[in-house]
């Protein structure tokens, strides 16, 4: 199994059209799991305050051939975007569920020495939303200042259900795990969530970045 994360920046008014077209095409693809992610500013999470010029697409594929067919077919329409970044990812490990199951199906692999991607997803219980918002602010600020963070952003999967998550790229596994597991505001928020049961489901996954093409925010992402 391999994974893909594709980011695109479009002129205002174009991103929604392109994203919806890709969602329809994705339903007919060989992807084992695919989500069109609605980019949201992390500081607004989980409220659906959209970033109207961006579109993100995350998927899991049985092999590189299946991913290649999708990127050479339906995803090629994103080639006209103002900016694009395509990442090919290898699942390292995942915990929890997204949509009722672990998208990785328990698959694991050894981490590498290069950049890594972290993806989180959660569905917040409405009654616990105020507590989540109070705890989330310091975590977002800590993430933005974390050593080794290359990029991060938020997304909403289903605004009506308060489904939200984060995407982040890191220099290496050491930097990513230091933020995720070291004592501090993030671990305090994780403990508070677990003790309070704020989420009806949540998922965390780490991926090794195997290949990249393009740039983001004007900076090439080079392995």
Predicted features along the sequence, with ranges:
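Short S/T/G/P-rich N-terminal loop/turn motif that feeds into the first structured element of a domain
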Residues: 1-55, 62-72, 78-164, 174-182, ...
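Helix-loop elements that line ligand-binding/catalytic pockets
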Residues: 167
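Signature tryptophan residues that serve as conserved aromatic anchors
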Residues: 60-61, 170
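Extended hydrophobic/aromatic segments used for targeting, binding, or gating
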Residues: 178-179, 185-200
């Amino acid at each position: 199994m391999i994974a893909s994360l594709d980011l695109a920046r479009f002129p205002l008014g174009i991103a929604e059209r392109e994203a919806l077209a890709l969602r329809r095409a994705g339903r007919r693809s060989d992807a084992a799991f695919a989500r069109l992610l609605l980019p949201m500013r992390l500081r607004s999470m989980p409220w659906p305050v959209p970033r109207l010029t961006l579109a993100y697409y995350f998927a899991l594929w049985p092999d590189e051939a299946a991913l290649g067919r999708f990127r050479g077919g339906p995803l090629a329409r994103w080639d006209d975007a103002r900016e694009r970044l395509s990442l090919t990812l290898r699942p390292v490990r995942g915990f929890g569920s997204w949509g009722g199951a672990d998208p990785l199906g328990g698959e694991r692999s050894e981490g590498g020495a290069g950049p890594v991607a972290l993806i989180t997803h959660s569905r917040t219980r409405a009654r616990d939303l105020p507590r989540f918002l109070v705890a989330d602010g310091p975590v977002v600020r800590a993430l933005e200042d974390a050593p080794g963070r290359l990029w991060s952003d938020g997304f909403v999967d289903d605004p009506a259900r308060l489904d939200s998550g984060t995407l982040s790229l890191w220099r290496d596994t050491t930097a990513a795990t230091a933020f995720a597991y070291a004592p501090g505001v993030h671990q305090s928020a994780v403990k508070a969530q677990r003790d309070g049961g704020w989420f009806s489901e949540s998922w965390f996954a780490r991926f090794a970045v195997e290949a990249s093409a393009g740039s983001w925010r004007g900076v090439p992402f080079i392995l």
